[in-house]
Regions:
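Bacterial Sec-dependent N-terminal signal peptides
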Residues: 1-24
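N-terminal hydrophobic targeting/anchoring segments and the immediately downstream early-domain regions
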Residues: 21-61, 68, 72
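The substrate-binding groove and active-site-proximal loops of carbohydrate-active enzymes
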Residues: 32-38, 120-124, 202-211
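Divalent metal-coordination and catalytic microenvironments
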Residues: 40, 70, 119, 157, ...
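Solvent-exposed loop/turn segments at secondary-structure junctions
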Residues: 68, 81-83, 120-125, 161-166
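Surface-exposed loop and adjacent secondary-structure segments within mature catalytic domains
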Residues: 74-80, 90-95, 102-104, 108-111, ...
Length: 211
């Protein structure tokens, strides 16, 4: 009888953790097909916060600052369970390999660090939509390809470098677009007023000084 109880509890726990390790796609979370409309910055932030709550064993999320208009700037760390637990060791080893840290030789066999940043120009809006899709595919338990990548790679994602410029353009576009978007560059939704969404709050092009 005791063996049956143990087996039963094991199956229950396995089913629970299998169910728990799921994540909604951007389409499911946002309620519309990704790319069918522009997503405001606060909803992008919400998706990243949702993702880290759904998959904390593979993701860490930091708010490294705020824009001049008070929008959060995020950096997500995505890795395998094993590598996420030793992020600091991987960071220090990377510094050793670059010669910045000289306390001991670097190990060339440790995971590589890949940094992906999106939407440095606010009106190049598809990039932050792609950031949500990228995050989902990296965390999706059913994606065997990205699971393999994360065995030797740590991925950093900044979903939007220029939230102020992005929202300036997204708000304009969503106010001007009709029921069906018009791809003609001369249509009203593409003719944003000065200063446009490319630049940040202070009319600075962040692609000239972002590092």
């Amino acid at each position: 009888m005791n063996k049956k109880i143990v087996v039963f509890l094991f199956l229950i726990c396995t089913a629970y953790f299998s169910f728990a390790q799921t994540i909604k796609s951007p389409d499911e979370f946002l309620g519309y097909p990704l790319g069918s409309k522009y997503t405001p910055h606060h909803k992008i932030v919400s998706y990243f916060k949702y993702a880290v709550s759904a998959m904390p064993q593979m993701m860490k999320l930091d708010e490294y600052g705020q824009t001049n208009e008070g929008r959060p700037l995020l950096l997500a760390y995505i890795a395998s369970v094993e590598n996420l637990a030793k992020l600091e060791d991987i960071r220090k080893n990377n510094l050793r390999l670059t010669g910045i840290l000289t306390d001991q030789p670097g190990n060339v066999n440790t995971p590589a660090i890949v940094w992906l940043s999106y939407n440095v120009h606010g009106n190049e809006t598809s990039s932050s939509e792609a950031a949500m899709k990228t995050l989902y595919e990296l965390l999706n338990p059913a994606n065997s390809k990205t699971k393999e990548w994360l065995k030797n790679t740590v991925v950093l994602i900044d979903p939007c470098i220029n939230p102020d410029g992005r929202d300036r353009y997204v708000n304009w576009f969503n106010q001007m677009v009709g029921k069906n978007a018009n791809p003609d560059r001369q249509s009203r939704e593409h003719m944003e007023p000065w200063p446009g969404g490319r630049v940040n709050h202070y009319n600075f092009d962040l692609n000239r000084d972002w590092a």
